[in-house]
């Protein structure tokens, strides 16, 4: 009987090793999200109405604790990032076909219209410009210095002015 038990235990141990039964628990890494606020208005970059839809507009609005104002920076090679909305998992997208406005769309790593770079423009205040890879001399701009909620930023020629400078406040979750 002892020999049968020993054989069964050996077989069970071998099966566990093959199946990876002896694994080490790993915690999921925390993702750092950022809330981007325009310097001139203090308003946050927001996916309008918390929409999950492909093509939903990115707008500026009063900063809240909503996940539609939190964005992860996903590495896209050569110092560029995809800016992914926490609430929808979709990425900020711009381009000529969108009249250089910003929307969320399904993330596709091979789309240059979804790759951005963050340019630090003021080390003291931590202000950045968000520039699309296809238009390196252009950056995310709130039009006409507007401070109104619901205004959709577009891509404008970088002039290092306050509607083009954004604070990036980290939030880990």
Predicted regions located by residue number:
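Lectin-like carbohydrate-binding module/patch detector with strong preference for beta-trefoil
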Residues: 28-173
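Secretory targeting and sorting signals
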Residues: 1-27
């Amino acid at each position: 009987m002892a020999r049968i038990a020993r054989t069964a235990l050996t077989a069970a141990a071998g099966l566990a090793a093959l199946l990876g039964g002896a694994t080490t628990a790993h915690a999921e890494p925390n993702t750092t999200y950022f809330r981007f606020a325009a310097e001139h208005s203090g308003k946050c970059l927001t996916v309008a109405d918390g929409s999950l839809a492909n093509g939903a507009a990115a707008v500026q609005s009063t900063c809240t604790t909503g996940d539609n104002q939190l964005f992860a920076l996903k590495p896209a090679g050569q110092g560029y990032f995809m800016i992914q909305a926490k609430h929808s998992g979709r990425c900020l997208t711009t381009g000529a076909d969108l009249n250089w406005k910003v929307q969320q769309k399904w993330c596709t790593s091979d789309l240059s219209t979804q790759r951005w770079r963050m340019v630090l423009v003021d080390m003291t205040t931590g202000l950045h410009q968000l520039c699309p890879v296809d238009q390196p001399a252009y950056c995310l701009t709130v039009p006409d210095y507007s401070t109104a909620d619901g205004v959709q930023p577009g891509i404008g020629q970088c002039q290092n002015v306050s509607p083009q400078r954004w604070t990036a406040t980290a939030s880990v979750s």
